[in-house]
């Protein structure tokens, strides 16, 4: 017997299925961890984000907002890195991080929390579009285990993941606000959180989402006012988020990302036909990436039921709701088009990164259709149609990856059997039983997919025990410049007992609380990187050693002297004869027993230089004495009879200002990298103050204030409009039960 549930769920059922959604996500994470305990601690998570949390947390505990750390050089401008300095939840993550030694555990717990947030956000969206709670829960449990999210954003690209988690709540709250069932504050807050993760893709995707929702609500409600109201509030959130990106925009000219060109190439552009693989768990799509053409992971997979379930939608009834679902369809279509190119749009590169948006849009569309118009009448004919769809899935997956055709056959047969079981439960028992099986099926599929992808090609295998790593690593005081190449470390030596007991790459130095030049940086500093041929992960070319000790002609000082570097660590695989060569003048070779296999170490003969006279690195025809020093400000007492110059161990980022005895004076950049100030002739004990602030910080602060003022105005309008005499809900308003859920979650 087919049981049809009401579209107006009770508060109790909304909470129960919301809890089921959260528990389902937790169970799914457990399945993934059984396949690979480090799945959520790999690639950029281990090499960029988690070490960054540790460093930022230590500085926040010291009462400092670390917008700039000069000793980190081209990775030290954290106003333009993915630090999330204006994102309160991210700051909380940072604050906790230094207290946790087990980084795998911490990263996994943090990501689990955001996966639950994401799942509940998708659950909310389904409800505001009228889905029954069971199908909404299926969508919520499924979304964290869609291909690209599971294997890239959750495993590696943390800011993309957190931005998506906040964005889906902005979507749900945006629809509620447009339909008069919620206020502007949730829309503003969730959008701001998505924008301020400090990663451009979620910000742009949030804009795409709001545009799609605005179009959808205009089509659905046939009036401009709700849409304009939503667009204004969203614009205010974007205005507040401007402070996050202004420093990057105003610094772009000196970074690797200083182009506004639109180019197309095949790298990580995904043909639309790959979406036909969305329901076959074994699928390995075909497009160009780091690993060639056929991918080693099912990154276009969305959900096992997504395509076959189309056979069980009552399309005659669904056609009557096309206006209400326009927003979801527009979003899914726009995301699908983006994945196919262009390959680069200014700072936006690699269109495959938008695959989670395709998954989100299609999953929402199908689950809302099922949640409102699922039917199991004529189930035999519909079953045949579903079998045909599964056959098409197999054909497309075979076309992309013919060598694994047997795995695709097994997956297709398993999918057919699972679908048949769900249909039987829906016909003989209830929708609840059918959906429960659908949710349970998510877990073994996630396990099999992750286990099948082992060993993951993404892992750096950095040590995850901070205490053990600190104990194993040399006690390097001061500032260290490492010249090495990560590619030269054999896979078997990427362990704490191997190379990682002596070498750092990416942000690993932050895990062990050592001060190293640079770190993981997607932005870089073009001229500094060129000077030392240093790449995004701190790897260098073989010529870096010569360049580091080359004399800068205008100062007569070597590059390492201008940087106030205390130590140079040479990767023996890159410089096998290093220790047999004479040390540069003023330097000496120092033995570190137990580390000779991997590194040769040069230190200054007269001890640490970074602790002397602030960050002054060169003085010409003048005297200069540091009187005060912080990461963003250098105060110096200077004198010069005939005019001179002071050079600082600071990278010449946009945002510096210089004053002499309170009067602004210009500054220069030596070798396109080092900040230098000309001292006027006749200066005697003058106070020189060099200060850095994130460029555009005043505009950004004003934008935040203006955004909040605008929000207050729209909140006043909303409260004023909810007086008791307000009109009854419109005929096509969303179910009351859905509004209750959003009230609880907003």
Model segments located where?
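Start-transfer (signal-anchor) and selected internal transmembrane alpha helices
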Residues: 1-33, 229, 431, 710-746
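Membrane-interface coil-to-helix junctions
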Residues: 26-118, 141-153, 157-164, 268-285, ...
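Active-site-proximal, structured, solvent-exposed surfaces of multi-pass membrane proteins
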Residues: 49, 613-746
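Periplasmic/ER-lumenal interhelical loops and adjacent helix-loop junctions
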Residues: 84, 234-321
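Membrane-embedded helix bundles of polyisoprenyl
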Residues: 117-129, 134-219, 229-248, 335-336, ...
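Contiguous transmembrane helix-bundle modules in multi-pass membrane proteins
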Residues: 181, 202, 326-339, 343-345, ...
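Membrane-interface helix-loop-helix junctions at transmembrane boundaries of multi-pass membrane enzymes
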Residues: 222-228, 310-334
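Soluble catalytic regions of membrane-associated enzymes that act on cell-envelope
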Residues: 437-626, 630-631, 663-665
